[in-house]
């Protein structure tokens, strides 16, 4: 998110985020400095508008839910998950129901098997890496045209590692 019509005059550009995973991916793009950004979405946007940051990274789902894409003060650029890898499980909706209930039968019909397979694969990778919520690790899996695809990024002491793999959906687990 940037302020509409504002061109940053400072170098490096200051980008705000609260996520270590996002910070390391932003730093790949050259002339930028990452600064910690805290607060609710309105607070973060106000800090951007007041000039504390040249841009901030926010989840599109949250901006959409809050109706903020219509705010005329801001410009929005969407980062593709294949390139700017999200946290594992991002975007998944989970619903709990009592075992054996009628609700569970309905929910099973609504379940997206491809999304479920992707989630299980992402969670398995996170477990294998021992990645907690503060780790700079991203994993994104999806099925497309009969192929299972996964992208992974992880910060190490030697820098950022990125990997992409693909294969048959039945081999995803």
Can you name each region flagged by the protein language model?
Residues 1-35:
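A conserved helix-loop-strand patch within extracytoplasmic ligand-binding domains
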Residues 23, 29-173:
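Small-molecule-sensing regulatory modules
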């Amino acid at each position: 998110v940037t302020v509409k019509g504002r061109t940053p005059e400072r170098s490096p550009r200051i980008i705000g985020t609260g996520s270590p995973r996002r910070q390391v991916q932003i730093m790949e793009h050259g002339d930028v400095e990452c600064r910690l950004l805290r607060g609710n979405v309105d607070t973060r946007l106000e800090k951007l508008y007041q000039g504390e940051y040249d841009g901030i990274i926010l989840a599109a789902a949250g901006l959409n839910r809050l109706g903020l894409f219509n705010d005329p003060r801001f410009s929005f650029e969407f980062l593709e998950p294949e390139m700017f890898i999200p946290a594992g499980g991002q975007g998944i909706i989970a619903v709990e129901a009592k075992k054996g209930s009628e609700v569970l039968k309905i929910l099973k019909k609504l379940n997206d098997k491809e999304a479920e397979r992707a989630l299980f694969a992402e969670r398995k990778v996170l477990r294998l890496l021992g990645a907690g919520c503060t780790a700079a690790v991203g994993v994104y899996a999806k099925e497309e045209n009969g192929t299972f695809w996964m992208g992974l990024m992880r910060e190490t002491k030697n820098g950022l590692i990125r990997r992409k793999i693909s294969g048959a959906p039945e081999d995803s687990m």
